[in-house]
Amino acid sequence: MSQRKYTLDLLKDAGIQGDKTAKMPLEDGYKVPREGEIEDSKAFHDPKLYRKLVGKLIYLTITRPDICFAVNQVSQHMQVPKDHHWRMVERLLLYLNGTSSLGVWMGCNKSTEVVGYCDADWAGDRADRRSTTGYCTFIGGNLVTWKSKKQKVVSCSSAEAEYRAMLKLTNELVWIKGILKHLEIEQATPMTMHCDNQ
């Protein structure tokens, strides 16, 4: 599944043309800046354009889990976007310019094994010290759900942030189990959860 045409239309709307691309959605080693940390923090001149493009990027995450974290970051500044937020959107668009045909591949597999992976960055947002949870789930080796979302509360330790991520993934796995049961699809093996705690 891919949204290549949608991506190309989005790039056209944004005025991205030519061969210029970016290798990653965000700069290598990206950290959420603290308030006042970036000198060029004046308001972006066209917040309506910012909101329109970020809204389209949010829709694109349906088939592009590789951009979820970056879109999560730029979508937090919809009310008063700054110039440096716009540069993040531009970089994301350049990344899409080089990867417009990517999507989610679904293979033919009779396995119903459900596996989930989760991670959290402890206090990754240096402005409010909240962590971001990320998880993805696979059925029979096929990616079926994914999410990147800022946690609602500040975690006091990396272990707490990881447990919160595992809770979100557990909720997702229980939901998937219910859907499989409703569809009368039997699971031969127990669900597996993997969590990175480094």
How does the language model describe each region?
Residues 1-198:
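Long, low-complexity, charge-biased intrinsically disordered regions
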